[in-house]
């Protein structure tokens, strides 16, 4: 049986990672899940990436110890469409290459279902192939509250961050499946089970 690929996306603060973890745990052994966020962190740790960031944005792209200045990128680059596209041009190609490597390794290992968590799937043009695109969504107020609580950001910064992404409604319209995550963990678990049940019974 050919391996299937499910792509998990959605808005910041919607609980994509929680959903992905719960979905993984429905299967034994747990399904492999590629995380674009983890891949971005790995790419940013490379000396070559830091050099590209300095070339594109100047010395302020790095902190004094020479690490990527994530706060500056978040506050200055992400809200600016032109600068954001420059940043995406640096980060996205190696991240997408890592995704395809992980997919290939999963297929070689004989995995039946491969998961990929790609938060900006639609923002980068929906170029990642998948048999099913799942959008994990929440209301804006819940997104804001969660991001303030989990990331320690003030409300204004959160709104700037969210405004740099597609509206969650636009992602929902394009989804193959939608997980609405405004409620409790129990509600999220129930939706995960509903989605996974056909595969578990196969």
Predicted segment positions?
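ATP-dependent NMP and nucleoside kinases share a basic, alpha-helical "lid"
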Residues: 100-108, 113-150
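Hydrophobic anchor at the beta1->P-loop junction of P-loop NTPases
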Residues: 8
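P-loop (Walker A) phosphate-binding loop of NTP-binding proteins
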Residues: 11
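ATP-binding Walker
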Residues: 14
């Amino acid at each position: 049986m050919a391996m299937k690929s499910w792509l998990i996306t959605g808005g910041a603060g919607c609980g994509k990672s929680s959903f992905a973890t719960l979905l993984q745990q429905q299967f034994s052994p747990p399904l492999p899940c590629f995380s674009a966020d983890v891949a971005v962190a790995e790419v940013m740790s490379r000396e070559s990436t830091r050099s590209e960031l300095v070339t594109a944005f100047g010395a302020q792209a790095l902190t004094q110890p020479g690490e990527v200045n994530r706060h500056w990128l978040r506050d200055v680059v992400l809200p600016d469409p032109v600068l954001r596209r420059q940043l995406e041009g640096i980060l996205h190609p190696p991240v997408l290459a890592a995704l395809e490597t992980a997919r290939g390794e999963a297929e070689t290992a004989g995995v039946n279902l491969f998961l990929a968590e790609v938060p900006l799937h639609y923002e980068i043009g929906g170029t990642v192939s998948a048999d099913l695109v799942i959008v994990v969504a929440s209301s804006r107020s819940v997104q804001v509250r969660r991001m303030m609580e989990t990331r320690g950001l003030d409300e204004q910064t959160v709104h700037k961050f969210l405004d740099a992404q597609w509206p969650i409604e636009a992602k929902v319209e394009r989804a193959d499946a939608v997980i609405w995550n405004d409620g409790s963990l129990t509600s999220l678990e129930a939706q995960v089970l509903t989605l996974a049940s056909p595969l578990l019974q196969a």
